[in-house]
Amino acid sequence: MDVYRAIADPTRRAILDELADRSGQSLFELCARLTMKHGINSSRQAITQHLDVLEAAGLIRTRREGRSKLHWFEGGPLKAIAERWPISTDERTFER
């Protein structure tokens, strides 16, 4: 999966925000935090599909612990994008 397509969806960006803030969450924890902090009331099945897309893009990694599957943020692909197109804070960059 393409990283750009993975981050194009606002729900997936919210999932990444939550995992960047607190990695190692289960699906249940993620769904609760998405509802409370972002007002996202998607089903567990829908969030699972979003997590699958993010994992395929290399933006998250998972590990099973007992019956739970835990999710971690993996920033490597985003770091590669930032390194490819660095953002300058120099005001002259924006002048024409």
Where are these regions (language model features)?
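Beta-hairpin "wing" of winged helix-turn-helix
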Residues: 55-66, 72
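Amphipathic alpha-helical dimerization/coiled-coil segments
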Residues: 17-21, 74-96
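Hydrophobic small-molecule pocket/channel-lining residues, especially in calycin-type beta-barrels
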Residues: 31, 39-41, 58
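Short, hydrophobic-biased segments on the C-terminal half of alpha helices
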Residues: 51-52
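Short, positively charged loop/turn segments that connect secondary-structure elements
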Residues: 35-47
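Short capping segments at the starts of secondary-structure elements
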Residues: 10, 22-26
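Short alpha-helical segments that sit at the start of domains
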Residues: 1-18
